[in-house]
Design a protein with these regions (language model features):
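A structural signal for multi-pass alpha-helical bundles of membrane permease subunits
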Residues: 1-222
Length: 222
């Protein structure tokens, strides 16, 4: 019964919404974080160290501190009520954790490879896509797992910005089973809660080998 959803909106719709948000946001995180990490690790420019320190400091800020300013900003942009606040910011490397992780991995790659590529006439873009990117695959897969799971389980952001039931992700749709004004359907709620963790579990078990490899290699190189 839980799969039937609410108000003619099936639970499959909520699953599709969560998959869309999680996959697109994860892609944005990987693309932006890897590019920024490469720039901080390999490119020399004024203020690089200050930018790196600022990124580390941003990791220490609780997300709740930024919620009100972010909401007001997204409201001015007209993004409230859409998926834009849940997706677009991740294309700008807003999560320092992934930048730091990938940057540490890139630091472990011998710079002699870059120098040899420059002698052959490669630009920074060629070095990144042809040399660095294939070598940081374990770090990218590790980041994929963490990013997907965090986006899939994100409840508070969806609660702030999504105001239509048809756009609810799974994390937000589950609360619809809990009705404080009447009896809650606990059977359906537990069944859907169990199904809701399946995508993250499947991804974790399929990529577990790469996750362990990425963490162990990052630890050795860091």
């Amino acid at each position: 019964n839980g799969w039937k959803g609410f108000a003619k909106i099936t639970f499959a719709t909520f699953f599709k919404n969560s998959l869309f948000i999680s996959i697109v946001a994860t892609m944005g995180t990987l693309i932006s974080s890897s590019l920024v990490a490469f720039g901080l690790s390999r490119c020399k420019f004024f203020g690089r160290r200050a930018l790196f320190v600022a990124m580390l400091l941003s990791m220490m800020l609780p997300a709740q501190v930024l919620m009100i300013p972010q909401y007001l900003w997204y409201q001015k942009l007209g993004w409230v009520g859409s998926y834009k606040p849940l997706i677009i910011p991740y294309f700008f490397a807003i999560q320092g954790f992934f930048v730091y992780q990938i940057s540490n991995f890139i630091d472990g790659i011998p710079r002699e490879l870059d120098e040899a590529a420059k002698i052959d006439g490669c630009s920074y873009y060629s070095i990144f896509f042809r040399i660095v990117l294939p070598l940081i695959t374990p770090a990218l897969i590790t980041s994929t797992i963490f990013s997907f799971m965090w986006r899939w389980d994100d409840f508070l952001s969806a609660l702030l910005y999504i105001n239509e039931s048809a756009k609810y992700p799974v994390s937000l749709a589950l609360k619809l089973f809990c009705d404080p004004g009447s009896s809650s359907d606990y059977g359906a709620m537990f069944a859907m809660a169990t199904l809701s963790i399946m995508p993250a579990m499947i991804m974790f078990f399929c990529l577990q080998k790469y996750l362990v490899e990425g963490i162990s290699t990052s630890g050795l190189k860091g």
